[in-house]
Amino acid sequence: MIRKFLLIILAIFTLWVGGFGYYLYLINSYKLNSNTTNAIIVFADGGHKIETCMALLKAGYAPILFITGIESTERFKNLLMKHNVIEQQVILAPNKIMSEEDNIKEAINFIVTYNLTLITLVEHNYNIPFMLNKLQKAIPSSNNVYIVPYPVFSKPKYDVLLKSYHRYLMSIVN
């Protein structure tokens, strides 16, 4: 009886470790993509994501940028000036501080309202699997939307990686 229990625990642990290994491979396998899309979407500020989006917008990767959860409009306006981006090319979600679910709902509303079919999602590489999964599940099946991940690479701490891995696992289950 104890032996069976230990074997089950060992099997679950082995699956978890194998899955974590695959997750580490996955988050480092995203390539920087040069495809032109209908829009660029970014969730919240931090880690040079907004700067990356502005550079992509300026380079012509998409005609419009949608941002949720930006903390400072003053910083945002400075970034617009720094990158010579026209303010009309950027749509800010109405609420400054939003939950992750609200960010996703706002992005879905944006995608559906503008009938977008091809979008670039700019996100930290360790968050891309989770955010892709959440977005793809939330997009209505009547909309045929292809999401191109554009990673912002960083060296997160192990606790951040573990948390992101568990969030990804939970997004698969839900």
Curated annotation (Swiss-Prot):
Keyword Transmembrane set for record: yes
State the UniProt keywords alphabetically.
Answer: Membrane, Transmembrane, Transmembrane helix
Record localization: Membrane
What GO cellular-component annotations does this UniProt entry give?
A: membrane
Q: Which domain of life is it from?
A: Bacteria
The main location class comes to membrane
What is the protein's membrane topology class? Single-pass membrane protein
Provide the transmembrane region boundaries: 7-27
The molecule here is called Uncharacterized protein RP875
